Amino acid sequence: MIEMFDFTKEVDIGIFNKIQNRSKLENKEIAKRVEDIIENVRERKDKALFEYTYMYDGINLNSETVKVKEEEIKRAYEEVKEDFLKALDKAIKNITEFHEKQKEKTWMDFKEGIVYGQVLRPLSSVGIYVPGGTASYPSSVLMNGIPAKVAGVERIVMVSPAGKKGISPYVLVAADKIGIKEIYKIGGAQAVAALAFGTESIPKVDKIVGPGNIYVAMAKRALYGYVDIDMVAGPSEILVIADESASPKYVAADLLSQAEHDVMASSILVTTSKELAEKVKKEIERQMEYLERKEIIAESLKNFGAIIVIDNLKEAIGIANEIAPEHLELVIENPFEILGEIKNAGAVFLGEFSPEPLGDYLAGPNHVLPTSGTARFFSPLSVRDFVKKMNVLYYSKEALSSVKDDVITLAEAEELTAHANSVKVRFYND
């Protein structure tokens, strides 16, 4: 069960090291397997892709069956309920509105004889990986697909491993709702490799985004450079900062919501109230009993969960900035008062009625967030991840003439005489 630490008596940083190091991708056996899969798909294309799909997913595919057909989409709509469609439409609206606000514009500055600026262009093609098989994550479709759509990406390709009955109808409906028409029934490292290099059936893309297991994460990391990626995401995590005003029931529920992801997920409570800490611990035990994934939750909380009692909120803020959690909840009396002191977090949820799952599904902000301390230097997925910038420069003859000697001087200081000559030939005779 989740362990309690009293930092008012003794600080134990071991728990933080354990949590931050839990997702290091250092399994050499898996890395070698991923490397072999990538090389095989690169060389043998469809043949290797379909062999791995049968080996790992038990699905026998070919060039005719790998792509989801229109009738499969229609059938998916028949399998989902009306309340799902209504909730999905609300989520799409909110997520789209949030990401529309992120759009940047091309800009140009004009001086006498000089024009410079930056031109924005959407990526031409993007591949979205959506976990599948027995799982169903329509929210991943929305969070990865909508910012790409808002950015103006022309070709969005989605891959998701199929179960015995195909890809989840919830996933197919979500993709169709946001206009993704090119969907393939593949997953794992082999799908990532297929998107990076292209095969006879799968198009090559410029960028790959979306979550997956360790094979998917390692493949994305290995292929970065051949193709752009969003990030190498680790296990999910939440840090809750709470004071005596917080509801033990709410805090416990929020910690449990992350612990159910998998046994590597991390759920931490940092509180100024020992009484709250004890109540939350009891509430966790009570709520766990009626949750479906309680075995996973128990393992997660045992290995990577913690309830930490500290002296004051300043210490709590220091812990949050050090851990740089994926999700940070501020369940305190005046959360906006300390927001300015939070430097490192993927997403911040303020107040007792802003639970993390609200951000996972419906509110609008993206749920693709940096994990494992990388919120110190990475940001959430956004429209900007699907846009590239080109610098633009124009000088008239007169404008170049006014700075030619300076350019020549700087080039010669670096002993790049051809650079200097490129300017000289425009003004000086041989």
From Swiss-Prot:
Name under which the protein is recorded: Histidinol dehydrogenase
Which pathway does the record list? Amino-acid biosynthesis; L-histidine biosynthesis; L-histidine from 5-phospho-alpha-D-ribose 1-diphosphate: step 9/9
- What does the cofactor section's free text say about binding? Binds 1 zinc ion per subunit.
Gene Ontology cellular-component terms listed:
cytosol
Asked if the Swiss-Prot or TrEMBL record annotates the protein with the keyword Amino-acid biosynthesis, the reply is yes
The similarity comment for this entry is: Belongs to the histidinol dehydrogenase family.
Q: Which cofactor does it need?
A: Zn(2+)
BP GO terms, sorted = L-histidine biosynthetic process
**MF terms in GO:** histidinol dehydrogenase activity; NAD binding; zinc ion binding
Please state the gene responsible for encoding this protein. hisD
- Pfam families found in the cross-reference section: Histidinol_dh (PF00815)
Q: Which residues form the active site?
A: E326, H327
> What organism does this protein naturally occur in?
Caldanaerobacter subterraneus subsp. tengcongensis (strain DSM 15242 / JCM 11007 / NBRC 100824 / MB4)
Q: Where does NAD(+) bind?
A: Y129, Q190, N213
Task: Check the record and name the InterPro entries matching this protein.
Answer: Ald_DH/histidinol_DH (IPR016161), Histidinol_DH_CS (IPR001692), Histidinol_DH_monofunct (IPR022695), Hstdl_DH (IPR012131)
KW Magnesium (keyword) present: no
Instruction: Name the job this protein performs.
Output: Catalyzes the sequential NAD-dependent oxidations of L-histidinol to L-histidinaldehyde and then to L-histidine.
Q: Which residues are recorded as binding Zn(2+)?
A: Q258, H261, D360, H419
